[in-house]
């Protein structure tokens, strides 16, 4: 954004707590009273977040008071408000991040980076690239987060990539294999669960499911490799009745109807990525990949999809 004659990065809210609550009220009026909401990019600098050793809920969204009001409203209706907290990667310095010990290392001893790439030219995009946290730091970071979260009154968190990412650390001083990291992740999830948090996990590596209250971004289709003759709803058969689960966001797929039918086939919940403000805010930003996310555009379709899902599958779905 231009500030005078100087281009500057400015943090703006894609959704506010007040407007999210208004949308939730509209859903309830339309007969949808069983849903959960995940707040993505709502702490520590937004989508390009800092390490969660401290906790600052974005003022542009409504701050800590706005968060509490929304969380209480949803809880009164029997629904959950998950706060997205990522313990495995970080985009920015700050919040006490020690880059010498808390960032994992490649075998080359360079800091471990999860690179993002520009869809326009295929080149590495520094703005969407994240550094991977050293798994040996998970316990310390989680301890600091719990102290900060207690003051805000947070009960539900989405541990994001902890359910799908598994990286080693090849710093010769403290080398970790991916198997070592798996055991650390299990210990971290057990720590959070035993501390009273309801956990939403992405992807759902098998060793994480024991600790999940719900799982999202579950793969409901095959990889599409030509050697595979058929796609069967294997994941749905395994998870059904054990944990609440949903696939990837329907409104981010090339074929909405096909993805919707796959959700029904697998007995999965419906998952949408939405924002309450004008989607043009995302143009020419690192979040421009979130296309077609306007609440106003999708509300009618969401109500229709919920009714269809209820008609076909409600009696046997969890």
Name these PLM-found stretches.
Residues 2-140, 164-168, 173-174:
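Aromatic-lined carbohydrate-binding/catalytic grooves of carbohydrate-active enzymes
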Residues 27, 157-160:
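Generic structural signal marking isolated hydrophobic packing positions
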Residues 87-90, 94-154, 163-318:
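Active-site-proximal substrate-binding groove within the catalytic cores of carbohydrate-active enzymes
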Residues 34-36, 78-82, 155-158, 196-200:
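Structural preference for beta-strand elements that scaffold enzyme active sites
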């Amino acid at each position: 954004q231009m500030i005078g004659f100087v281009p500057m990065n400015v943090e703006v809210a894609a959704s506010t707590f007040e407007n999210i609550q208004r949308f939730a009220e509209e859903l309830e009026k339309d007969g949808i009273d069983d849903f959960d909401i995940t707040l993505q990019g709502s702490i520590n600098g937004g989508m390009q977040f800092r390490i969660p050793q401290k906790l600052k809920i974005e003022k542009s969204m409504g701050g800590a008071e706005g968060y509490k009001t929304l969380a209480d409203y949803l809880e009164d209706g029997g629904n959950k408000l998950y706060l997205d907290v990522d313990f495995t990667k970080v985009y920015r310095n700050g919040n006490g991040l020690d880059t010498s010990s808390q960032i994992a290392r490649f075998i080359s001893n360079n800091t471990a980076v999860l690179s993002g790439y520009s869809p326009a030219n295929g080149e590495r995009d520094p703005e969407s690239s994240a550094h991977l946290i050293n798994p040996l730091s998970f316990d310390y970071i989680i301890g600091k987060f719990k102290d900060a979260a207690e003051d805000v009154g947070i009960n539900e968190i989405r541990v994001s990539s902890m359910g799908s990412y598994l990286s080693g650390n090849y710093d010769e001083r403290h080398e970790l294999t991916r198997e070592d990291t798996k055991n650390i992740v299990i210990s971290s999830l057990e720590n959070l669960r035993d501390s009273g948090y309801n956990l939403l996990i992405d992807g759902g590596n098998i060793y994480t499911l024991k600790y999940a209250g719900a799982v999202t971004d579950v793969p409901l289709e095959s990889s599409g490799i030509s050697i595979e003759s058929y796609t069967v709803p294997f994941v749905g058969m395994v998870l059904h009745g054990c944990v609440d689960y949903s696939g990837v966001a329907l409104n981010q797929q090339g074929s909405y109807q096909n993805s919707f039918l796959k959700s029904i086939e697998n007995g999965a919940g419906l998952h949408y990525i939405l924002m309450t403000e004008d989607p043009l805010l995302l143009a020419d930003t690192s979040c421009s990949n979130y296309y077609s996310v306007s609440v106003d555009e999708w509300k009618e379709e969401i109500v229709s999809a919920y009714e269809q899902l209820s008609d076909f599958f409600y009696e046997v779905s969890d």
